[in-house]
Amino acid sequence: MSFIDIHGHYAWNIDDGIPSYEDARKALELARENRISAIVATPHVTPGVHTKDDIHDFIQRIDDLRMLATEYNIDILDGCELFLNHDYQKALDQNLFIPIENTQYVLVEFDVRKEIGNEQEIEERLYDVQFKGYTPIIAHVERYFKNGLDIERVNGFIESGCIIQVNASSFLGYHGKQAKKIAFQLLDEGLIHVIAADTHRATGSRKPCLNKIFYLLEKNIIIMLFIL
């Protein structure tokens, strides 16, 4: 059995992710040890900041990563993590983002530093992504609810056609107690479509950890079934 990781910042020296070619090698080695067979490279794209030339450079670096990853028998897929900020419409209109491997899926994120915004700030932006013909995959949903999980809100995302992604590292508490609590709540409620590593480093709390999470959650699910 192997994993496909749809969220990873392995393309070095272009965002806050892997800083160097050497670190990319180390991260890919760890990914292989974690039984990851394919990675969607998702550099951060910030509307109003990144230009058409930047997107071109990102794609070129992803190609470099793809070549490197062949040494580890890992497939690399094109993608990005599109920040739906106040300039998001410009990015949508000018195609300043990278859908996952030219499909209708695009990984999107909001500001993790504060409580998730109101419907006009969030749901309207997700709708606009869909109106352009894309399916939003909402990155690390567990990190947006600073004041506690709003299950109805997440259900609304799903009912509108969005995909819910949770970070593997949140189950380990690497994003704080609140994010860990919400990650397990989402799991218990059956509201997670994808668990991804969101790898940013080759060491520390943001390295590949899907294998560890698989066994952790497998154990928890078995315990839940036993109790039931």
Residues covered by each model-derived region:
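Mid-to-C-terminal alpha-helical segments outside catalytic/metal-binding sites
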Residues: 209-228
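His/Asp/Glu-enriched short active-site or ligand-binding loop at hydrolase and phosphoryl-transfer sites
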Residues: 161-173
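Short acidic/histidine-rich active-site segments
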Residues: 189-208
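An N-terminally biased module of ancient metal coordination in phosphate/nucleic-acid-related enzymes
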Residues: 1-73
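Active-site environment of divalent metal-dependent phosphoester hydrolases
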Residues: 46-49, 84-85, 143-147, 171-174, ...
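Active-site mouth loops of central-metabolism enzymes
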Residues: 10-21, 109-116, 171
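Extended substrate/RNA-proximal surfaces in nucleic-acid metabolism proteins
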Residues: 51-160, 164
